[in-house]
Structure formats: C-alpha cells, structure tokens
C-alpha cells in the first residue's frame, strides 16, 4: 500500500510542479493572461501562485507535512477555477468549452486535494513520508 500511495502522490504532484515551472519560466506571458482575467497585481500573483504550486507540490511529493501541502494546493485551485476559468463569462462556444474543462479540472483537483488532506491528517500510516502530519483529524 505504501508504494501505491507514493506512486499516486508522485502522479498528483507532477501536475502542480510542472505548472510551477511554467509560472516561473513564462511569468510575463502568464501575467498578461492573468491581467486579461482581471487579476490584480498580475505579475506578483503569478509568482506567488507559482510558489504555492511549488511548495504544495513538493510537500505532497516528499511527504513533508503533506497535509499542509494539500491545503495549499486546495487554496490555489479553487480560486483559480473561479477567477481564471469563468466559463460562464465566455460568449464563444469553443472558448466556453475550453474554460469549462479547465474549471472542472480545477474543481476535481480541489476535491482530490481535500481528500489527501483528510488522509494525511487522519492517519500517520500512509508511509514513505519524511514527516508526519501537521494537523490531526482523528
């Protein structure tokens, strides 16, 4: 079971770590996109969200307070879904569909982040982690 959980953590974290790299290597382009969506202080927001993605992703991947890392990712993906992928504001059907896919993906990742938080905070028995949970749910 420990190995399966580790494989799941790796697969989950890779998405966020890859996105963090994009935030740091394509900051100006992402800031322009963020500004077009009405995000205030777009460049600072891109850098801050990149840091959230990196810290949360590494935390889950390495098992260092993975419960906290899961919450950090949750705090990123749910607002990002609403702010960056507001499909209901799109008039072009193709753009609307694309934003809906991204919105739904972020909501699903938020659900997965919440489940990971609960798993990590409920039991220290998930194995192959560097630290135990920061929070304790039971």
List PLM regions with ranges.
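Extended, low-polarity transmembrane helix blocks
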Residues: 1-29, 36, 40-51, 55, ...
């Amino acid at each position: 079971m420990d190995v399966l959980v580790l494989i799941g953590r790796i697969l989950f974290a890779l998405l966020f770590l890859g996105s963090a790299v994009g935030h740091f290597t394509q900051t100006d382009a992402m800031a322009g996109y963020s500004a077009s969506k009405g995000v205030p202080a777009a460049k600072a927001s891109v850098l801050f969200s990149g840091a959230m993605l990196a810290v949360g992703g590494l935390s889950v991947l390495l098992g260092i307070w993975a419960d906290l890392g899961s919450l950090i990712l949750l705090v990123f993906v749910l607002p990002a879904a609403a702010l960056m992928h507001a499909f209901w504001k799109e008039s072009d059907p193709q753009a609307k569909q694309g934003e809906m896919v991204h919105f739904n993906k972020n909501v699903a990742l938020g659900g997965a982040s919440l489940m990971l938080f609960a798993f990590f905070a409920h039991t220290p028995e998930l194995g192959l982690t560097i630290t135990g949970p920061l929070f304790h749910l039971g």
